[in-house]
Amino acid sequence: TNYKKKIKQLEDDLLFRLSNSQGNLLDDVELIEVLNNTKITAQEVNEKLANASETNAKITEACEEYRPVAHRATLIYFLIAEFASVNVMYQTSLKQFNEIYELAIDDAEPAQMPAKRIVNIIEHMTYSVYLYIQRGLFERHKLTFALMMTNKILISAKQLSPDNVNVFLKGGGSLDIKSVRKKPKEWIPDKCWLDINALQKTAAFSDILDSFDRNEPMWKKWYDLEAPEQVNVPDFEDRITKFEKMMIVKAMREDRTQVAAQAYIGDAIGQRFVESVPINVEATWEETTPYIPVICLLSAGSDPTKLIEELAKKKKLKLSGVSMGQGQEIIARKLIQTAVKKGEWVILQNTHLGLNYMAEIEVYLTKAEELHDDFRLWITAEPHPQFPIGLLQMSIKLTNEAPVGMRAGLRNSYAWVTQDMMDAVPRYEWRQLLFTMCYLHSIVQERRKFGPIGWNIQYEFNASDLGACVQFLQNHITEMDMKKLNSPTWPTVTYMISSIQYGGRITDGFDELLMDTYAGKYFNQNALTKGIELFPGYRVPDSTDVTDFRADIEALPLTESPEIFGLHPNADLTFRTLAVSQMVSTIVDTMPKSGGGGGGKSPEEIVNAICADLLSKVPEPFVPEIAKEMLKKLPGGPTQPLTVHLRQEIDRLNIIIILATKTLKNLQLAIAGTLALAGDLVDALDKLFNAAIPASWLKKSWESATIGTWFQGLLMRHKQLDKWLREGRPKAYWLTGFFNPQGFLTAMKQEVNRQHAKDKWALDDVVMTSQVTHPPKDVEQLKDGMSEGVYVYGLFLEGCRWDGKQNKLVDSDPKKLYTPLPVLEVTGVLQKDKVTKGVYEAPTYRVKKRTGLNFISTFPLRTEDPPSKWVMRGVALLCSVD
């Protein structure tokens, strides 16, 4: 531009002289000199312009050459932005990202060849950003982030099909088991078979159904392996990618998906992306400035305060702190005012309890002009939706989750136990019970990871519960010593531990029973036996020195079997499957709501096809007038309790059928452009695209994992009610098919009570009892219904299985999480006649989620083992396992 301006200036000057020249131009020496200078300068400028143009072309070429770096950076930044929807605390600003990006370019390994330099920058930048982000993620989200990043990188490089990602995430969720090819063998779970049918639609697995027909024994052998992801996939190993192998692992052995995902990530972008990176508070501090605070995200059992205190001590800097809460803002302001002047550190703890002050901190750090170079601000907070986003985006995030496992739990407890505490009571019973109490505390905490089979509700048991129990035990043993007693008062001990201290947090009745069972197991006379093993390999140390206890704890296994909690080894499968389910849900929830679908189709086209398919299957609603007349013709008339129940079920199912039909038709109209796509229709479009159930349907119906299983349930419910209405009472009832199963059981009791009118039974004295048909029967084997009571079917046992030959509960088979219960005889008896010995009262729930709203009743099942065994196993009956 400067060169062009210079030429223009010379031209203007020359024209000016020419226009103002007088006489003969050739006699004007000065004009001729200007003309020569202009010519020479113009030549020089043109040469420089040519050089500049050539240089510009080279720069443009170099820019294009380095475009893959910018492309990778863009891809990762948008992933980070999407991932903030997983947890509001995962905010990262564009400014932060650019700083990491520029630093990564500077730090990447140099290379002579531009192509190699570009590869070095991309790899270094990708890993640098990954390290920066993952240290601020909770453990459960780290693999998810790495998997999403790997998928995006491979899709961008055309090495992975978005269609395959969709199939991996959604599986056979939109399929119906009755509309796909029949399973070759019964050992294949329905869910697995639906997922396999979904795989068949991809290019790599187009012949997988034929493979199962040909090589079913090989597939069975692969399915039964402990780690199938490490072994060749039958028929497919040589022709599938690591991602496709992960797809088949998820379809067949969902519990091994995360291990397969690690192998896929390691193969695609490097093993370092799946290796655990230990927390480094000092390295984090080195990245901060007085204007960039560190936010430590808190989780159960984690507190980074000690690490920060140790670093401050190492750096010889004063650290002041305050735990936020009502009225603590004044103290915090004073601490910060002093620290910014003197160059000290401040830690604000539990700031989720002082969000207004956090907004003030954001403004202060944004507008502050001069802060002491040594000043640093540390913040600890639990995730909170109202936490200031601006403060999150200017901060470095850090997580420091507590180690998991029995050894880690006992280690934490004995980091708190001191030698003075050990010496507080000069009796070995005190040290025995102190260790046992710490052991029980770890048991109840670690059991939470198994989901509903662990605790129905996830309780926040913490150090204060342990501390209260330890204080009680110390007082109790001291009193025992003073009174010269030989042993503690065990009923008092178990009551205080299970009902008062830990029980104060427990709100579910079956969780209370579990806590009582644990307390009774560990706190009895056997607990005073020196050297007792609380579980094989977990011996109570016989010592008076706290260091011996700590040494024994360090020698314990790093991981433990579910059996230590009283659970079946299969519970590990439950734990891993739950983790996979959460990972997949997280990925689906972060996916953009629009974009390409499978086979190049848009989401609207895919949903339109789903709507058409469902509308072709949806049953007609019952006609109220016709149903009313048919109810009158049923035995006993329309006032019989079970007939009243039938009428109520028909009314509720009609609401669902009408709602579903209306939603599907309106969606088709909206997709066609003749109806506005708004409100519930937007949600329905999104949910159906992801093989999920629209929220408006869930509000009025039942829980289900996918739209396929939900719709199958709708058809089966309609079939049961329609057959009952047309043909009279069925021989057996599918309990899962009722909106109100409690009402059904109550109606059954009322009818039994009426049958005993001559015996003058009072309805309040009638209770429900049950027994499994012996020999066990399927519905097809029943000839008639029960004369008194009802046959019920469709229930599944979780945590054990039913042995038909021995007619009792027994342990589950390996890898069988749920087993069908044979037909159950359910009737009513007087309270005084109910059998209570030799039975386990199995709680029964609608779905796997064992909340109070899903609880139906308890069914007594015969057992030769103590019922406490099944309580600790978490045994329950489920109406639906999807």
Residue ranges and their predicted role:
Residues Y3-T74, R407-K521:
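Conserved AAA+ ATPase small/helical "lid" subdomain
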Residues L31-Y127, L677, L681-M748, R754:
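Proline-directed phosphorylation-rich, low-complexity intrinsically disordered regulatory regions
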Residues Q91-K341, S543, F549-D552, T559, ...:
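Extended, compositionally biased accessory segments flanking or bridging domains
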Residues P278-T284, L307-I308, I331-L335, E362-T366, ...:
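Eukaryotic intrinsically disordered and solvent-exposed regulatory patches
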Residues L298-G301, N350-H352, I379-H384, E401-P403:
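A short beta-strand-to-loop transition that corresponds to the Sensor-1 phosphate-sensing loop
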Residues K313-G321, K334-K341, W345, N350-I379, ...:
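Conserved catalytic/switch belt of AAA+ P-loop NTPases
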Residues F387-G405:
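A short helix-turn-beta junction within AAA+ P-loop NTPase domains corresponding to the substrate/partner-engaging
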